[in-house]
Amino acid sequence: MALVPYTETAEMGLQRFHKPLATFSFANHTIQIRQDWKQLGVAAVVWDAAVVLATYLEMGTVELRGCSAVELGAGTGLVGIVAALLGAHVTITDRKVALEFLKSNVQANLPPHIQPKAVVKELTWGQNLGRFSPGEFDLILGADIIYLEETFTDLLQTLEHLCSNHSVVLLACRIRYERDYNFLAMLERQFTVSKVHYDSEKDVHIYKAQRRCLREDL
């Protein structure tokens, strides 16, 4: 699914996932994200990495107005919703099983005049990538999508397909396991990777990646 399963040791930490709504303020809008831990599990709750990435977008470090963006493994859709509110044209993606829930959050939180800027589409990493034009997006977003090692090759293939030489990838994650570093090492073979933000309170890192370009004069 979309977001990473991990063990919250504090009982209070788990309680927030069982609330039917998670409320946030971004881009001068109140956003109410519907959650459904009981029925849909980890893909249907808002994890810290999504909040940190949405906050980073709101900082204005990345120019969103008019840009073409895609969110991978969107889950509840928070990051894509915020990107649309900040002016991006966003394709918000997840696996087919998650789409109905994802659409409900997107439709509930975008004003009518902004809704045309946000499209929800099915995307399973590594499959049917021909539905998307190569290098179609300026910005690729992912929050807590690095978690299952068996998906790393498909995720990397998907990033390579969606990126042009000028695209920017922003991945927000909490480093929990050695395999998380393994993915970053895989990513660095095809992309230049740098850490651009760290939220110490939530222990979430944001990594920026851009496709490595071969020098034409070599």
UniProtKB/Swiss-Prot annotation:
It is found in: Cytoplasm. Signal peptide: none annotated. GO terms for biological process: protein methylation. It catalyses: L-lysyl-[protein] + 3 S-adenosyl-L-methionine = N(6),N(6),N(6)-trimethyl-L-lysyl-[protein] + 3 S-adenosyl-L-homocysteine + 3 H(+). Disulfide bonds: none annotated. Transmembrane segments: none annotated. It is an enzyme of class 2 (transferase). The keyword Translocase does not apply. Keywords: Cytoplasm, Methyltransferase, S-adenosyl-L-methionine, Transferase. Protein-lysine methyltransferase that selectively trimethylates residues in heat shock protein 70 (HSP70) family members. Contributes to the in vivo trimethylation of Lys residues in HSPA1 and HSPA8. In vitro methylates 'Lys-561' in HSPA1, 'Lys-564' in HSPA2, 'Lys-585' in HSPA5, 'Lys-563' in HSPA6 and 'Lys-561' in HSPA8. This is Protein N-lysine methyltransferase METTL21A. It comes from Bos taurus.
